Amino acid sequence: MLTLYKFALEPIAELSGDPGSYGFRHDRSAEKAALRLMDECAHDDEFVWVLKADIHSCFDSIAHKWLLSHIPMDKQMLSRFLSCGYIDKNRKYPLRRGIPQGGSLSSLLCNMTLDGLEDYLHEVCGEN
């Protein structure tokens, strides 16, 4: 069922997604990111800033409240996905924050959460 929601959300995420974001996106890869970077640098006589980011505990830090208010999908289904938790040694642990890594929606929800970061960095740091 969640995979169907993923298929429904993917076109929305692609339209609203940051153009410079290459992680967990259809038809994007590290190789394509490197090619775009080389192309950007080849046509510019000025210095170009490059940001490679690894957001520490990104999946574990995403607030459920934010997701429920910003992700355009059935709120009850999203809430169930977010609260499913995990099982370790026959004991269930609920999630109060973050999204389950490896879930069919997880990488898409992470990307949708980070959308806007590229524009914010351009605004704060300048266009280049």
Regions picked out by a protein language model, each given a short descriptive name:
Residues 7, 11-20:
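Charged boundary/loop elements
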Residues 19-20, 35-128:
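Conserved polymerase palm-domain catalytic core
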Residues 1-9, 110:
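Active/ligand-binding-proximal structured segments within catalytic/core domains
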Residues 1-2, 30, 34, 38:
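Duplex nucleic acid-engaging cores and interfaces of nucleic-acid transaction enzymes
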Residues 23:
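Basic- and aromatic-enriched surface patches that contact anionic nucleotides/nucleic acids
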